Amino acid sequence: MSSEDQFTSIQWDRDDGENTNNTPTDTTIKSKSSKSKKSKKSSSKKKNGNKISPSSTTETSDADDTMKEVTDQLESTQINDDNHEVDDGNKEQNVDANQIGNSDEDPTNSLLLPVNPQPKEPQEEKEDLQQQLQQPQQQLASIQQEPAPIQPPFNAVVNDESLSIQQQQQQQQPTGYVDISYYEKYSIKTTVTHPNRDLDTASKPFISYLVTTTTDNPSILKLTKEKKPKQGEEYLTFSVRRRYGDFRYLYESLSNDFPTVMIPPLPSKSNFKYLTGDTFSSEFVHKRLHSLDRFIRFILQHKILSQSSIFHLFISNSNDWATFTTSLKLKDSSSDESGIVGRVVNEDLITETVMNFLTPSKHKKETNKDILEINDKLKKLYENLIKLDKIFTKLKKKNHELGNDYDQFSNQILKLSSVQKGEDSIMTTNFKIFSDSLNYFSKSYNEMYRYIDENFLISLQDLAKFCLRFIQLIKLKNDKSTDLAVLQDFLNKELANNSGGSGSGSGSGGSGLHQPPNPVISSYQGGIVNNTTQLIKDTLSTSNTTISNTIKSDKIKNLEQEIAKETKILTDLTNKIINEEYPNWEKFNKIEIKNSMLGLCDQNIKFYNDLLEKFGEVEMKLIKRLDEDM
């Protein structure tokens, strides 16, 4: 196929596509394109005759020419759309003339092609375009003409506003926020009792403690298996067993969620008993039991901690706590594999300690009178608790030794009764009665020793630890105030340096900026290299002046923002310590000391009452024996 035939077939295909799409065409454009076709045909004939390029080259060039013609035609149609109404008569005449004049050359006029339907008139095409352009305007007008929404009643508006305010408040609430409205409405009573030795999945022994809760708090009831109290009962009582590791998870979670709240300390796990292997002795287990029970009591009387979701999950009898602790174990094992040094060493704590050590002492002085008074009270209370602990530790040892002595004394009296067994039965009976009384006295002393050692002394030691923990909270506040004072001094220095630099430069330019270097030749000629070096230095210093001033202003702005942030944190922490944490701690401390002293008094009263009853019986028996002998 020659290049002319190829061009004709391409033109036919193009015209078929135009006819099927019913796109209006201008015959004047066709006449122009026909002229270009003739010239291109002649050029293609020349190229074929001279054999300059192969047929593939002519095919690609013809295809490119057709694409250019199509684009030219589209552009011309877009340009002539606006003039369709004016030139309708001329276009009809041009169509007839072009159809007659170009019937031999234009393949669209060939008799071989089917008769095409009449294309749309230019007026109709213009109307279609106008309708398409008017669609977005109509949509906009319809939106603007929509009727106003019906106003809801006043109560509905108020409810919607209250809901929106509540949502905003929930969004503004911090992560550790707890709703304390349930603290006054509902009651929670939890005790830790009955330690028991169990085996885990790896057959390793451990001690579990029975945590019994009685409550009507709905946030706790929904976590339990029962979901609600029994019919006719107001409170629901349920129990669950927890081991020491569960208490440790609770403590760490509360410490992370409430860093500015006084969290009671747990009994230390790094005890000497763990090295000796005596971790399952009755003495050690009961000491830990009383400490854990006191830990729970402190949480119960705290408005925030008692209403925390993690504590509710801890005391509930559902299986969600096991899932929670398992996920924590997996997270800890996957996140930290740097060994014991990486787990124990706290980089932030080391940095804070070093920085506070290097900080001048003038910033470490406390100025708040309330904080100073609280700190003094805590230190005095701590010293008194330590003194009581030392005194009762000595008394405990004395009681323990005295109990052993009475035990040995009763054994010796019992031996005397066995010696006198064959000689005098009356003396033997009297020795047995007296030996039993001494044995009872020894057991009573041992019970007194056990109570002082496992309960009373542990309460004093725990309260002393609570004092230290509260002192640490005050120390956190002091560290924040020290940081704030250091930041304020640093800001003052920056402002002074900035004002000094601007004052020195204001004499020449008034704006605090250095003037550009002047090419003044000094009397000393140091050579081209020295002069060029000095010029470069002056230029660099001048170019850096604006940047350095911008950096200084940004630094001052950042310092002011940080100071405002630290001031707010410090104010909130100070108010919380004075108005919330210390009154709560003082109330708990008074109750615990009172209960400990009352418990010690009750134990002593019981001890001496039992001795009076026992020795009264012994005295009556001995007097009766003497009367019989008389």
From Swiss-Prot:
The subcellular location is: Cytoplasm, Cytosol; Preautophagosomal structure membrane; Endosome membrane
According to the UniProt entry, the coiled-coil residues are 361-413, 550-581
- Recorded topology in the membrane: Peripheral membrane protein
Specify residue ranges for compositional bias: Polar residues. 1-11, 19-28
Is Transport found in the keyword set? yes
Which molecular-function annotations from GO does this UniProt entry contain?
Answer: phosphatidylinositol binding
Basic residues bias locations: 32-49
Under which name does UniProt file this protein? Answer: Sorting nexin-4
